[in-house]
């Protein structure tokens, strides 16, 4: 069966639409004659801006509404920032494609007052804006003299708050800034020795309905195998730790020759306890490598740390 029409579900935020429009353009180029439409919508995570993400809960915070459209037959695929896509998907849906990864690093963005500073030179009491518990925990571990403040809203709103003086700096994903045309605002790429990135950060995940090989065949044109292999290991680690998108679990992955090197981290919210380790193995065992590293981290106390965090940030009723 040759697919002639494809319906995409997308978040309607500016970054999400930039990403979805890129996917649409790439698919149209790969499949001339394919008619593609986009339905944009707000998700729960887009609507609730006055509560910290971890307090809302992270079960499909930015994905559930898109998945509902596929499950009722109103969309064929959904485009996600892969870091927002839970590791356990609803029955009947699958991760069909992972695109080539942009730089997954976290980035320091400063206002004019702090233009001369790097992360290491920010003065005591400097206010750092982040909505990520992962970034918060790692930076608290390395920079306990800084003050951390939650920041919500889209990237443009966050930059406006920074430039208005509400924060001295922000920590944002370099990939998102670049895709939105704000690459010039990246003041410093934070080394992985300081901040391991989120699982899947920098890659797009295309989710689709199971049992539709014609859709899978179309979207596989955008698959980047090395990125998919790395993210398979990262997502296996996250799934095995029973973590979610909003907990302080960080990763870094590299492919060297035919081997995958995976680094993982779990930290307490105050940053005082940080467990970090590595696992290496053949690239055809990438999922097993993720699971094995998770077990190693658990043996060092990661499970206890995560249990405390889940209790502390239990979603509000």
Curated annotation (Swiss-Prot):
PROSITE patterns: PORPHOBILINOGEN_DEAM. One of its GO terms (biological process) is chlorophyll biosynthetic process. The modification S-(dipyrrolylmethanemethyl)cysteine is found at residue 245. Its cofactor is dipyrromethane. GO terms for molecular function: hydroxymethylbilane synthase activity. NCBIfam families: hemC. It comes from the Bacteria. PANTHER family: PORPHOBILINOGEN DEAMINASE (PTHR11557:SF0). Monomer. The keyword Transferase applies. This is Porphobilinogen deaminase. GO terms for cellular component: cytoplasm.
């Amino acid at each position: 069966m040759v697919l002639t029409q494809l319906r995409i579900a997308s978040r309607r935020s500016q970054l999400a639409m930039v990403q979805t429009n890129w996917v649409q353009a790439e698919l149209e180029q790969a499949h001339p004659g394919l008619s593609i439409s986009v339905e944009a919508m707000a998700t729960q995570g887009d609507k609730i801006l006055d509560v910290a993400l971890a307090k809302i809960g992270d079960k499909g915070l930015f994905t559930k509404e898109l998945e509902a459209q596929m499950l009722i037959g109103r969309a064929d695929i959904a485009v996600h920032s892969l870091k927002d896509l839970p590791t356990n998907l609803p029955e009947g849906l699958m991760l069909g494609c992972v695109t080539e990864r942009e730089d997954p690093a976290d980035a320091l963005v400063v206002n004019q007052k702090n233009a001369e500073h790097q992360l290491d030179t920010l003065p005591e009491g400097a206010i750092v804006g982040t909505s990520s518990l992962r970034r918060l925990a790692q930076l608290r571990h390395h920079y306990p003299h800084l003050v951390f403040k939650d920041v919500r809203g889209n990237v443009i709103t966050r930059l406006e708050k920074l430039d208005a003086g509400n924060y001295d700096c922000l920590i944002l994903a370099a990939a998102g800034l670049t895709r939105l045309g704000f690459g010039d605002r990246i003041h410093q790429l934070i080394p992985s020795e300081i901040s391991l990135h989120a699982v899947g950060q920098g890659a797009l995940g295309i989710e689709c309905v199971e049992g539709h090989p014609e859709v899978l065949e179309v979207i596989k044109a955008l698959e980047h195998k090395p990125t998919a292999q790395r993210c398979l290991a990262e997502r296996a680690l996250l799934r095995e730790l029973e973590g979610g998108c909003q907990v302080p679990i960080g990763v870094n992955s590299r492919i060297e020759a035919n081997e995958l090197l995976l680094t993982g981290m779990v930290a307490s919210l105050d940053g005082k306890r940080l467990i970090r380790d590595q696992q290496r193995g053949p690239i055809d065992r990438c999922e097993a490598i993720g699971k094995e590293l998770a077990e190693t981290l658990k043996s060092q106390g990661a499970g206890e740390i995560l249990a405390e965090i889940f209790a502390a940030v239990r979603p509000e009723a």
